[in-house]
């Protein structure tokens, strides 16, 4: 409702969603491709900016796609757990005697990340402007979709609880001698024990297994 009245507002809304998810989803490909992209694509199609019709790309879809790509990179750089390669940098720094915590990374990345967050959509809006500037129907569409989805389910509440537990442990885990890897397994265990996820879900996450193998 706040961001949905213009194409620029939609860009900021999608970027904000990415930033909010980044601390607890340490895979920028899963976050960008699996969560943000389907939402962004649905928005574009709702305004007749269709991937299969090149003549409609510039109406809205191209702008939102480029913006989501850059916002994903910005969100990934702001948090230690924003992408899988960040903990590797932390390890390399530790080998040089430099201790980087979740909080110190966030403190260093917050200001440049925040500046980029506000500047990038505006720059893209000037350099690669969408043909559609006003999207007044977006809030109504969102409200209708929320109504169709119904109230938040028990599993969604449990997922939200796990999100905040993980975020808290990643931030304060150092003081409790709980490292980031242990925190990730705690979160996975909670989701499995509460049946939010099944082992079949875990096995089907090919991207996560790729990350474990290649970044281990």
Where are these regions (language model features)?
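Hydrophobic transmembrane alpha-helices of multi-pass small-molecule transporters
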Residues: 95-100, 104-216
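Hydrophobic transmembrane alpha-helices that form the pore/transport pathway of multi-pass ion
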Residues: 2-78, 84-96
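Residue-level detector of functionally special positions within alpha-helical transmembrane segments
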Residues: 26-27, 75, 82, 101, ...
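Flexible loop linkers connecting adjacent transmembrane helices
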Residues: 1, 44-53, 131-144
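Phosphate-binding glycine-rich loops and adjacent basic patches that engage nucleotide phosphates
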Residues: 1-7, 49-56, 83, 127-129, ...
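Short, flexible micro-motifs
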Residues: 78-79, 85, 112, 190
């Amino acid at each position: 409702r706040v961001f949905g009245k213009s194409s620029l507002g939609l860009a900021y809304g999608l970027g904000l969603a990415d930033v909010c998810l980044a601390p607890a989803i340490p895979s920028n490909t899963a976050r960008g491709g699996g969560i943000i992209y389907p939402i962004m694509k649905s928005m574009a199609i709702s305004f007749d900016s269709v991937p299969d019709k090149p003549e409609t790309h510039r109406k809205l879809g191209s702008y939102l796609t480029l913006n989501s790509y850059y916002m994903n990179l910005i969100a990934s750089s702001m948090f230690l757990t924003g992408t899988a390669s960040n903990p590797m940098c932390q390890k390399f720094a530790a080998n040089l005697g430099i201790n980087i915590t979740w909080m110190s990374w966030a403190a260093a990345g917050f200001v440049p990340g925040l500046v980029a967050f506000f500047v990038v959509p505006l720059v893209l809006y000037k350099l690669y402007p969408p043909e559609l500037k006003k999207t007044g129907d977006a809030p109504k569409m969102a409200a209708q979709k929320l109504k169709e989805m119904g109230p938040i389910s028990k599993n969604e509440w449990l997922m939200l609880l796990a999100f905040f537990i993980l975020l808290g442990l990643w931030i304060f885990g150092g003081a409790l001698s709980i490292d980031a890897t242990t925190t990730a397994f705690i979160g996975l265990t909670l989701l499995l024990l509460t049946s939010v996820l099944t082992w079949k879900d875990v096995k089907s996450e090919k991207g996560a297994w790729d990350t474990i193998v290649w970044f281990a």
